[in-house]
Amino acid sequence: DNFKKASEMLKSAKRILISGHLSPDGDSLGSMIALSTLLNNAGYEAFAVADINALGKIGFLEGTKSLIPLRNLKRQKKFDLFIAVDCGAFDMMPPEVRPVAEKLPTICIDHHISNTGFGDVEIVDPYASSAGELVWRWAKWNEWKLDKVIAEALWVAMITDTGRFAYDSTSPRTFRAAGDILK
């Protein structure tokens, strides 16, 4: 089970870097924020990195305050684990992230059928509505608690990639995740 393998990788990690794709949309950004908050709440040191000048309409998310701006990535201490979210290929990540990520063990969390399989551990499900849904499933597997920041970020992730639950990617599991997030 890949949730188990990914959770095992976490056990030896001290500092975790999380990134999504270039020009993050709601799923990419929401998944990064939710996952970094979940991991920090669980006692890990997790840092999500993004181009904060390119957030546009989704910059309202409360969790954006904790993002590391891409321009500051080089000033960070070393990381020992990388997690890519909503990223179907390594070259879809920001160029600033790639030289750091390529040296690290990698977990890839993605829902694109075109995913190239670049992670050491893959949490990839092309039937999932969004990367946010997969982050939610991993959180449930680990029994991590959702707080307001996490719930808001996961909600934005899911409504972005489901077209507010209108696209074919929306499934009963998507609605179960959404219902859990709203609690």
Q: What are the roles of these predicted feature ranges?
A:
Residues D1-L22, I33-N41, T116-K183:
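A structured phosphate/pyrophosphate-recognition subdomain
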Residues I16-K78:
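Anionic-ligand anchoring segments at beta-strand to alpha-helix junctions in alpha/beta enzyme folds, i.e.
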Residues L17, F47, F82, T106-I107, ...:
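Hydrophobic "anchor" residues on beta-strands that sit immediately upstream
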Residues H21, D51-I52, V85-G88, I109-H112, ...:
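Fold-independent oxyanion-binding glycine-rich loops
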Residues D25, L35, I58, I83, ...:
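Divalent metal-coordination and catalytic microenvironments
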Residues S28-M32, P94, S171:
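Conserved strand-to-helix beginnings and helix N-cap segments that scaffold or border functional pockets
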Residues L38, T64, R98-I107, W141, ...:
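A glycine- and small-aliphatic-rich helix-loop capping segment at beta-alpha/alpha-beta transitions
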Residues I68-V121:
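Active-site cofactor/cluster-binding pocket
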